[in-house]
Amino acid sequence: MGGRCVAKAAPVSGPCDQLQSVYFGFDESTLTADARAALEADAKCVKEKGGKLRVEGNCDERGTAEYNMHLGQRRADAVKKYLGGLGLAARDIATVSFGKEKPICTEATEECWAKNRRADLK
């Protein structure tokens, strides 16, 4: 009758519900060996289950809001590029930067800052 049916990818479910965050060094957007290993496990799961991903880049509180927005985006883009190299389609991976706006730890310590220098996969 002229209607359209648009199929949407199902969100990742099952064991992929807990995708791993990856962490970065200070002022870095380069993936560490640990980050690459975590992303390889995540990519395998997503390939098996299907679905779309959103990569959220985050930073610690140091630096300007503008600088950290750009750094968070570089982190998200680095993750997307690596996942693409593992066979995930770029069209199925969205990226966003939250800069320093979504800390998971708020203490002014190196240990806390390290927890905030991350990319979360959703």
What are these regions (language model features)?
Residues 58-122:
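Periplasmic OmpA-like peptidoglycan-binding domain that tethers envelope proteins to the cell wall
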Residues 1-53:
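Periplasmic peptidoglycan-binding/tethering modules of Gram-negative envelope proteins
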